[in-house]
């Protein structure tokens, strides 16, 4: 409570984290490298979450890339102009997204003739994408 917190990344996890931090009495600065907040997020989810966040004094900084975290600040680079900005903060939360970890699938592909990776193991995305990839895999089973 009472801290200035930078949340780096504005996907759903970053926005939900922002909401909790706001509710706990913190001032939150949301930093997003993309030009828009919550890029690639379904607009219904984005609008719902932003409606809860915007009643607080949350700062949004789209188009900024995290360059460095210091003891009491974050240094950000504007993605268009390359200008650096220093924002004083007490805490930093990294919410930078996910990448699939599929080393097991790669190992199994060398041992078995038919291995299919589905869902977030092949590509991070939405639940609908994961279900669709699983359905496609099942339909290819002979």
Regions found by a protein language model. Name each.
Residues 42-43, 49-50, 59:
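Short acidic, glycine/proline-enriched helix-loop-strand junctions
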Residues 49-52, 92:
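Acidic, Ser/Thr-rich peripheral helices and adjacent loops at domain boundaries
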Residues 1-41, 77-91, 95-142:
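Rossmann-like dinucleotide/flavin-binding elements
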Residues 59-61, 116:
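General small-molecule cofactor/ligand-binding pocket signal
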Residues 62-73:
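A conserved short coil-to-beta-strand element within the FAD-binding core of flavoproteins
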Residues 59, 67, 85-87:
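Residues that recognize and position ribonucleotide moieties
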């Amino acid at each position: 409570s009472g801290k200035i917190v930078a949340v780096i990344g504005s996907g759903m996890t970053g926005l939900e984290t922002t909401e909790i931090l706001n509710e706990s009495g913190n001032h939150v600065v949301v930093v997003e490298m993309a030009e828009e907040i919550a890029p690639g997020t379904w607009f219904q989810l984005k609008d719902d979450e932003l409606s809860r966040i915007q009643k607080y004094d949350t700062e949004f900084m789209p188009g900024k890339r995290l360059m460095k975290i210091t003891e009491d600040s974050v240094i950000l680079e504007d993605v268009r102009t390359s200008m650096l900005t220093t924002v004083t903060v007490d805490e930093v939360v990294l919410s930078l997204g996910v990448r699939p970890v599929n080393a097991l699938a790669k190992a199994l592909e060398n041992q078995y003739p038919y291995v299919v990776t589905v869902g977030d193991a092949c590509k991070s995305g939405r639940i609908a994408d994961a279900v669709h990839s699983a359905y496609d895999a099942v339909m290819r089973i002979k």
